């Protein structure tokens, strides 16, 4: 077939005689083998003849040669003459058009040479008349044309003249009679056809008219389809194929009048003819109306009208008149519905569907817009009926419910109809396709809807239980895909168009619940967001649903929940997605709708509840909604409303939770923690587990009991009926394996909130998100612990080392998750051991319990070793670590009070039921039974917990000796204990906070070796600033609870000597290191006595005050908020001392004033605390009642032997000194001992002078004295700043086990001894003056050389000042009430200055001025106040040695009066000296300013402005323990304008506050700071 394209190569023509002729003949022989006219070889044969002839015309070949070869070829084919005639016809046309004479001549010669091959008749048919004339076949072409016209006219246009009145009428009558006879016998179509032919011939009937008559009779006799089809097939074999189609078209056109209506019989005939392929659809389609473009225009018009309706419905109507207008428009539109014009295409389509010709019906629908045909009810019903018939066998097999019969559907008798489906695989053949064309209009046939859904349900059951081969699985997956498509395109849209059919909704849920939620939610998403835009009817339905939803929601209130709920339910059956979308949008705006909406949803179907869950998730995931408010510090209200709605609706109704839980998990995976609010609400509502920091102590106590007590007394709301909802939540978590992943994600996200999200968000928001994440973790973990069985829990939660090392779970969270597992496991092991030996004694039971604990906890002890570096286990044992983290409050104590309280409540409730006369007897009986059962449960639970606690305590008693190892110092042990145990857990939850405090107490009560209770408490109370500052809001609340419980224990011991002696007297936790008597440097252990413990407690209270004041003064939001929260929590036990309480009150009042406009939330917190603090003022006591101050022994031997301070306990808690004390320190001691007494006397008289001159009763010269004293106070404040250096802080000592400490830390203790010894040596006035001048020169040297020594000397002077202040305060409080404050602080004993004050006034100023020069050390600012107080107290005690023990009040007043007179005289003399000293003070002040850090200086300038001169105005040490606090007070004192009275009162306050707490011991605080840095 190489010649297919170029049939006759040019080379053949050139070599014609040699080879070309033979090649051509061979080619023609090959091409002649296929005789079919439709084949390509036939066309190639024609092409070969044409090319041969064309070469002749061109002159390349002679016509004789061509005629000869054509003659040879004629033998190959019978149709050779016809083919050659066709070739000549084409060449005739071409040569005529070319008008080239040579070619025309060659053509004529060729035709003449071939006349013997082609007959004249054939040539006359195909050649042009002019060509025929030139060939001589006709005489004249003109005459030939005229003759042909006449013949054609006669044949085609001239009508035959019949005798219509006789022959034809009779013929048609006989024809109709022939066709209308009874066809049930042996009459066949062939016989009838022969008779018809006879009639046509006899009566000369028109064959076309006969065909028309046959079709008419066919219309009237539809039951004889087979007969007429056979007849028509036979008849049409004699006619043109198009004739039948034209006649039918003519019939359809007859009815295309404006009011014409095409009969259904004609549609049916046309459909049957199409089905049997007697006519072609394309031929008939052109005869039908309306045209396709008209149909498309109509479809577009419907869409536009639907959108207009939507726009009208969504318009805002402002008046009732417009409402009336809208209603009238609706009525007009309903009246406007006219009879639609006759659509012949749809009529034919309906007929095709009725007879089961799906292929032709499908072709017609393809010509139309989507769902246009099915939107006509008759078409939709016809498709539905065809589907009914097709699925009948399959439905009967798998879909009919048990016990139901149903009416069978008869199959079509037509063999050409679609085959019925016998299996699910058969559905793919036609049924799914039919549904796709039906679309949302399945709504017209609810029965078919139910059938399809039931078949789908059966398929899903088979699909889920199928364990067949891979090939079958692939087939079923294809069917599943088709089923999901049908659900998306047909079932859900059809449900939308149904008129609120709740049964269909429930039926559909029967299939939907077999789908995974991923499939369901995808279908809901398509339904909500895409389906309603696919069809005009659905567009209208959506608008109407929204309009109706608006109407209902506007009228929904708590009072009409029931009727409104019915309306919502009715509306939701068909269009739940649209309805819920609108309802949720309203809930997000108005949270007061949540309760009525939740109550009104009780009429929904199961499918609607599932759709509601999807709509909630979609609303939560809305990317257009901001999750934060505009201030970027709080979560948006819409999210909070949705969360609240979620919790309520999921608890009340049986909604699948899987999707929501997975959504939260996915959000956590993506590092987003906002949506944890949803989980928190769901768990709270469904499981009844509340997480709140506002729990009362009664609730907190109830939470330490069993599950029943927790439910009854542990929550704010009475949580009931949560059994079913919590079971649903548990099942959802376990079925989808989300329990552990959610826990781990939350635990990891806590850090993610800070380190991933924290940088972009406001600190306040980060704290809230952290709290939310943490609280939800605690709540969720609590739910799992109380609801999961032991097997479920152990199976899902891995071991502690896997949690921490592989899943990177923080240790506190990991133990929180593992703790219930340990408890469950121990309990189950214990039960197993008990069952093995029944009836054993209590001791055996305890032994079995301990054995079970060892079995369970031994692997844990090994696992925890990998959690920390090996050095940690030198301080605490893994057993102790695991024990601490594995126990709970339930294990340590039984809340008897809570059990008793709840039982009493039930008794009262039962009495109220008995007294209620209106309650029906049955209900009364039922309620009493419920209360009795609950009471029995509580009592049984209490008994069970008591036994459990006893077993746990026995276990701990056996374990305690191995808890704390003696490999390192007690200080390091306590550091690790606080860092790894107490601090992480005390801020984990409120119950854990209580647990930590109780555990410390328990370890103390167990007399645990190597555990220093005193040091532990000291480390907790000494410096809380860093801990408080690093807490979130809820953590601060928990930390406050922890401190409150610790303070409660301390207060109990402090308040009663007997209690202290009983609980602490002989306990190793209160064992201290005493410095040995004499100077041999040895140490020995001794117990801390009661009075010294009271001093310690006062020091702790003071430390708390100082830390609180610091936080309040920082101005930082978190510092202020957290300390206010902590202070509120510890309010029952702190402050107890009046002066500390007053200092706090002033600071909080200042916060109230400053934050009122700036930060309202801080203002609210401060006001709340301020009010509570004032209400507790009556419970506060003076300092001397809080801790007793005993006078020291007078003899020097006693003071040397017992240490500074006079009492034997003064060094009881001091840190043990090393044996190799340096000789330099001994020299300092001996030098200072000889000078101390005189300084104390001088200081006392000076302070008395200050007190008298600041009373406001002195002469005119006293005002100068007041100013002078104010300046001295300013210097004193400066000195306090300078004293804050690590090397010279008196509190910087350690209560160590072995007495090992650094020399730098010992130094202040030795200096203290030396100073207090020196104070016992009296000197004369002249010696004093001389000594002070020498001291001044020495100080100048020390300022430039040795800062530590300088700091030490300033401390000495500070100590010397205090006794006189204390005495002055006592005098003044006895003489009269202070005008400004009116606060009384009694002091023990009465003091009088035995020395004239004029001699000591000048040296006192010198000392104060030198204090200013010391350098401040901010890093240890938290300890300075303690050192001041302790120095002052010890010097006060020394001064008591030189004063008479008792003086009458009258004598005291006389001596005070004399002192006052003398001081007035001396004041004039001092004025002269003041001028001389002022220059030196200015220079000292400027030096001090240079030493202040730059940022502090800048802040001073900003705060004070031009008031830098009045630097002397400050308050008590408690009020301003930090450098910047003094400057803050300057503005306050300046603006008050009360310099005289106010400042003197402040100095008194300062003396009052600083006079407490003897320097009997000092705990190591520098190490505390270091360790606190570590553990925080």
UniProtKB/Swiss-Prot annotation:
Keywords: Coiled coil, Cytoplasm, mRNA processing, mRNA splicing, mRNA transport, Nucleus, Phosphoprotein, RNA-binding, Transport. One of its GO terms (biological process) is RNA splicing. A motif (Nuclear localization signal) lies at residues 923-928. Residues 1184-1576 are annotated as: Disordered. It comes from the Eukaryota. InterPro entries: Tho2 (IPR040007), THO_THOC2_C (IPR021418), THO_THOC2_N (IPR021726), THOC2_N (IPR032302). The modification Phosphothreonine is found at residues 1385, 1443. Residues 1251-1263 have a biased composition (Low complexity). Pfam families: Tho2, Thoc2, THOC2_N. Residues 1218-1234, 1265-1285, 1294-1343, 1353-1383, 1449-1504, 1524-1552 have a biased composition (Basic and acidic residues). The modification Phosphoserine is found at residues 1222, 1390, 1393, 1417, 1450, 1486, 1516. Residues 293-339, 896-965, 1464-1491 form a coiled coil. It is found in: Nucleus; Nucleus speckle; Cytoplasm. Residues 1416-1425 have a biased composition (Polar residues). Its main location: nucleus. GO terms for molecular function: mRNA binding. One of its GO terms (cellular component) is nucleus. Belongs to the THOC2 family. Component of the THO subcomplex, which is composed of THOC1, THOC2, THOC3, THOC5, THOC6 and THOC7. The THO subcomplex interacts with DDX39B to form the THO-DDX39B complex which multimerizes into a 28-subunit tetrameric assembly. Component of the transcription/export (TREX) complex at least composed of ALYREF/THOC4, DDX39B, SARNP/CIP29, CHTOP and the THO subcomplex; in the complex interacts with THOC1, THOC3, THOC5, THOC7 and DDX39B. TREX seems to have a dynamic structure involving ATP-dependent remodeling. Interacts with POLDIP3 and ZC3H11A. Component of the THO subcomplex of the TREX complex which is thought to couple mRNA transcription, processing and nuclear export, and which specifically associates with spliced mRNA and not with unspliced pre-mRNA. Required for efficient export of polyadenylated RNA and spliced mRNA. The THOC1-THOC2-THOC3 core complex alone is sufficient to bind export factor NXF1-NXT1 and promote ATPase activity of DDX39B; in the complex THOC2 is the only component that directly interacts with DDX39B. This is THO complex subunit 2. It comes from Rhinolophus ferrumequinum. The lineage of its organism: Eukaryota, Metazoa, Chordata, Craniata, Vertebrata. The gene is THOC2.
